[in-house]
């Protein structure tokens, strides 16, 4: 059993390197390379299933140490894979979602001349995330961490001819650099105090609050929590398959996954738990508020991702890492599907992303519309869809905790807002009369478009049930909860849905004569980007100009250099000339008076 378990999972991971090796060996053979990549990921998914089934049946876990990288006096570094609860469940889900995204990319990117390079980047992106998830030491985890960072930069800036895409890619790197500083601080602290980066050794150490705060900063940067969040909506400048992969099962969940991995160190530290709780609550509310007034369909879905990441951070603050992980797994299905549906709509409407210029797509694109509605309902937490099993459990866990009343209230408000912006997409894009140009070449009959969306729709419907019924500890349902606590999430969701229906029908035809401050605050992302991307750089520019002109022109040339020397000598000479008046008679008189006085003294 152990042989089958280890070999199937390692083979699935190794298979992802086959397309990369093939491309290195035969760089000119690119005709069928995208299809080869898609087939490889599909086969890797089926190869990883025996390990998942063995884990479900027997609860088997293992740590595989293959070979020693290097050894110094204070550190022994090995290449080691940790196949435990989190990696065994996450890897098949990531492979399944990526398989669907790669198949969708065959349709979406078919006209791109560098599609083979695009698929190579996507495979590398997935591989680095799997390295991060399965790493058993911090060095290996850091390789995966930096790998997803650099691949996100390459993929967000895929259309490098556009200034916005380049700026968005740079934003992603720069904000993640701040998080990386926190990660490296934690690694340095562990090197000094523990002399080992292996997870099993780290978990026996009492980590300092400062080192754990470094991990929280790392997660804040990578998972776009409040303060380091502006890169996430900007990342929508990349192609839609990139957005789907970035937001579902790679990059953005890496920060949350890091905190889940280090939960044995966090669980007994109230400072860190409170920090993550408050940070997550602020993030989930702020990004939900921003999503309400956006008009770009991809940005609405992006802000919904950020809001769900805030919910996962809240769950870690509640000391519930398994619930946070369950939400990562269920969220991957419907979030990837929402992005693929958005990509289908955008591509069919000649790259139109404004929901105000859509409408009436329910009859024209039935498969995409059905999947979009299913994904939106799952995102809201509608009973018995994927999102319900994790989202409902998170809010129930908050109800049973007594330290976080305000976080509970904020999260419930954000849950209601989720229903509002989800329904807003449905209302504007799918219902009413068409508002797009009549010549749009709408066609959703291609199997590379419909098959991935249908597969992910199946996952969005059944994944939550399958996961919670088969995998502990979520399979053990608490039966002693008051009905009002159990129903609170559902009541809030239904309330938000009703308010959303009323708001959308009331505001659809009304004209806003003048923008109000609350609308501007939401639409302009809380003025965050204006403050940090405009005012600070402008202030730095003025300061730099002032320093340059003061230092070089005024100080050097006028105070110290040629003009300064001339001024210095003219000042000294004028002082001397003013003290020496040339009054010879007066000088002689004083000389004559002083001589008798000196003689008398002597």
Curated annotation (Swiss-Prot):
Pfam families: NADH5_C (PF06455), Proton_antipo_M (PF00361), Proton_antipo_N (PF00662). Its main location: mitochondrion. It catalyses: a ubiquinone + NADH + 5 H(+)(in) = a ubiquinol + NAD(+) + 4 H(+)(out). It is found in: Mitochondrion inner membrane. It is a multi-pass membrane protein. The chain crosses the membrane at residues 1-21, 39-59, 88-108, 118-138, 141-161, 172-192, 201-221, 240-260, 272-292, 300-319, 324-346, 369-389, 408-428, 457-477, 481-501, 582-602. GO terms for cellular component: mitochondrial inner membrane. GO terms for molecular function: NADH dehydrogenase (ubiquinone) activity. Its EC number is 7.1.1.2. Keywords: Electron transport, Membrane, Mitochondrion, Mitochondrion inner membrane, NAD, Respiratory chain, Translocase, Transmembrane, Transmembrane helix, Transport, Ubiquinone. InterPro entries: NADH_DH_su5_C, NADHpl_OxRdtase_5_subgr, ND/Mrp_TM, NU5C-like, Proton_antipo_N. GO terms for biological process: electron transport coupled proton transport; mitochondrial electron transport, NADH to ubiquinone; mitochondrial respiratory chain complex I assembly. Core subunit of respiratory chain NADH dehydrogenase (Complex I) which is composed of 45 different subunits. Core subunit of the mitochondrial membrane respiratory chain NADH dehydrogenase (Complex I) which catalyzes electron transfer from NADH through the respiratory chain, using ubiquinone as an electron acceptor. Essential for the catalytic activity and assembly of complex I. Belongs to the complex I subunit 5 family. This is NADH-ubiquinone oxidoreductase chain 5. It comes from Osphranter robustus (Wallaroo). The gene is MT-ND5.
């Amino acid at each position: 059993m152990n042989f089958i378990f280890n070999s199937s999972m390692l083979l699935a991971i190794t298979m992802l390197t086959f397309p990369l090796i093939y491309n290195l060996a035969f760089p000119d053979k690119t005709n069928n390379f995208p299809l080869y990549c898609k087939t490889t990921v599909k086969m890797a998914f089926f190869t990883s299933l025996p390990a998942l089934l063995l884990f479900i049946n027997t609860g088997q876990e293992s740590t595989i140490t293959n070979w020693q990288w290097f050894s110094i006096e204070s550190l022994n570094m090995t290449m080691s894979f940790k196949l435990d609860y989190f990696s065994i469940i996450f890897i098949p889900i990531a492979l399944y979602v990526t398989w669907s995204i790669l198949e969708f990319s065959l349709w979406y990117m078919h006209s791109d001349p560098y599609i083979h390079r695009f698929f190579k980047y996507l495979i590398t992106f997935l591989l680095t995330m799997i390295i991060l998830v399965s790493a058993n030491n911090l060095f290996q985890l850091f390789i995966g961490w930096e790998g997803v960072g650099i691949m996100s930069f390459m993929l967000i800036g895929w259309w490098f001819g556009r200034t916005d895409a380049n700026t968005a890619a740079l934003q992603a790197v720069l904000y993640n650099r701040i998080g990386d500083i926190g990660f490296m601080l934690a690694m340095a602290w562990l090197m000094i105090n523990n002399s080992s980066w292996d997870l099993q050794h780290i978990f026996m150490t009492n980590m300092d609050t400062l080192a754990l705060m470094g991990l929280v900063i790392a997660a804040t940067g990578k998972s776009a929590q409040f303060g380091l969040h502006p890169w996430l909506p900007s990342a929508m400048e990349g192609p839609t398959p990139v957005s789907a992969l970035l937001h579902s099962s790679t990059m953005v969940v890496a920060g949350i996954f890091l905190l889940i991995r280090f939960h044995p160190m966090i669980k007994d530290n109230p400072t860190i738990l409170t920090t993550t709780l408050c940070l997550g609550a602020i993030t989930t509310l702020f990004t939900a508020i921003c999503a309400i007034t956006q008009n770009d369909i991809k940005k609405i879905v992006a802000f919904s991702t950020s809001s769900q990441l805030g919910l996962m951070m809240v769950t870690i603050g509640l000391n519930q890492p398994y619930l946070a992980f369950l939400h990562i797994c269920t969220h991957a299905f419907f979030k990837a599907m929402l992005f693929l549906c958005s990509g289908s709509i955008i591509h069919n409407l000649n790259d139109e992303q404004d929901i105000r210029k859509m409408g009436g797509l329910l009859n024209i694109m039935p498969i995409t519309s059905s999947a979009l509605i299913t994904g939106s309902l799952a995102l809201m937490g509608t009973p018995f869809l994927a999102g319900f099993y994790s989202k409902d459990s998170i809010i129930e866990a908050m109800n049973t905790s007594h330290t976080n009343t305000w976080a509970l209230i904020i999260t419930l408000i954000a849950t209601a807002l989720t229903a509002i912006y989800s329904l807003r997409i449905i209302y504007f894009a799918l219902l009413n009369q068409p508002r797009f140009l009549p010549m749009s070449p709408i066609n959703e009959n291609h199997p590379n478009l419909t098959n991935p969306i249908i597969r992910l729709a199946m996952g969005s419907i059944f994944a939550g049930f399958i996961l919670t019924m088969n995998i502990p500890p979520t399979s053990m349902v608490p039966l002693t909860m008051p009905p009002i606590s159990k129903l609170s999430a559902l009541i809030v969701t239904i309330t938000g849905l009703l308010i959303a229906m009323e708001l959308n029908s009331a505001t659809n035809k009304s004209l806003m004569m003048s923008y109000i401050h609350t609308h501007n605050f939401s639409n302009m992302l809380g003025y965050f980007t204006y403050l940090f991307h405009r005012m600070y750089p402008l202030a730095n520019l003025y300061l730099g100009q002032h320093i340059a002109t003061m230092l070089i022109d005024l100080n050097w040339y006028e105070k110290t250099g040629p003009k300064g020397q001339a001024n210095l000598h003219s000042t000294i000479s004028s002082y001397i000339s003013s003290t020496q008046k040339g009054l010879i008679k007066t000088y002689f008189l004083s000389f004559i008076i002083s001589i008798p006085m000196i003689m008398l003294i002597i």
